[in-house]
Design a protein with these regions (language model features):
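Conserved adenosyl
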Residues: 1-208, 242-243, 254
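C-terminal alpha-helical "lid/dimerization" subdomain adjacent to the S-adenosyl-L-methionine
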Residues: 191, 195-238, 243
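Short alpha-helical interface elements
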Residues: 69, 219, 259-260
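General N-terminal targeting signals
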Residues: 61, 211-213, 259
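Core SAM-dependent methyltransferase catalytic element
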Residues: 243-261
Length: 261
């Protein structure tokens, strides 16, 4: 990193393709690096699965799921309960399906071809539908009530919730804003919720796990962990607003509930 910052006039990196990681590997970004090798991709998915076991899971909490998601959810045959956007091989969605048998709708796992291939091989719950999707493109699961162009073809009804787990900290603000704008266009006003499972670090006195991960995100992606004010500003620029933030312990990730502003 010293060499990178010396060449970069000690400016914070903002381009995912020009970071200490890409300088040291001569690759086109971290995700392209891991997807070039099936072994790397498998190890990365195993890392995500292990990480999932280490922290509290808001979607495991029966009271949280019942009071904030199931209550008021649509129950017709085409209803989509939750979309896990960039959900990898589906570890979190599988646990949700196993621990909550009464979910009133479909579960949709979205990611790129590589992770979806891993998911197909892992025999997920029959309630989970797999969908190849790049979150830098239009969200295909969208509601009739959103402000999207009326000429768009609505492929499915809107979901009760769209879930991002450790996705946006991989991207600098401009890229995160692009992702969020696509998602905002899919939300059904007054019904759909955006759930962001990420760290919300305090402006001072942050836990060392959070600050260490902040440096890692900078080195790999030119990205960062965010404070509450960072999140409010970013979501506001995307036409979204925070409804509530849950945090169980200082070192853990938080859950941000947001909706259309």
């Amino acid at each position: 990193m010293p060499e990178f910052f010396s060449k970069n006039e000690y400016k914070y990196p903002s381009n995912p393709l020009d970071t200490p990681f890409t300088q040291s590997t001569s690759e086109n970004g971290f995700f392209e690096y891991i997807t070039q090798s099936s072994e790397r991709l498998t190890v990365f998915q195993q890392h995500l699965a292990a990480k999932s076991l280490a922290w509290p899971k808001y979607l495991d909490d029966a009271t949280f799921v019942q009071e904030n998601l199931i209550k008021g959810a649509k129950t017709d045959g085409d209803a989509v309960f939750l979309v896990d956007v960039g959900g990898g091989a589906g570890h979190d969605l599988q646990e949700l399906a196993q621990k909550h048998s009464d979910l009133p709708g479909k579960l949709v796992l979205q990611d790129l071809e590589g992770p979806i291939g891993e998911a197909k091989a892992s025999k997920l719950s029959e309630k989970i539908e797999l969908q190849e999707h790049d979150f830098f493109s239009e969200q295909p699961v969208k509601g009739n009530g959103s402000d999207i162009n009326v000429l768009c073809v609505l492929t499915t009804p809107g979901a009760r919730a769209y879930y991002f787990k450790s996705v946006l900290h991989d991207w600098p603000d401009d890229k995160s804003l692009e992702i969020l704008k696509h998602l905002k266009d899919a939300l059904e006003p007054g019904y759909s919720k955006l759930l962001i499972n990420e760290r919300v670090i305090p402006p001072t006195g942050a836990h060392w796990l959070s600050t260490g991960l902040d440096i890692t995100m900078m080195a790999l992606f030119g990205a960062k962990e965010r404070t509450e004010e960072d999140w409010r500003q970013l979501l506001g620029l995307a036409g979204l607003k925070i409804v509530k933030i849950w945090t169980w312990e200082p070192a853990a990730e938080s859950l941000i509930e947001a909706e259309q502003a």
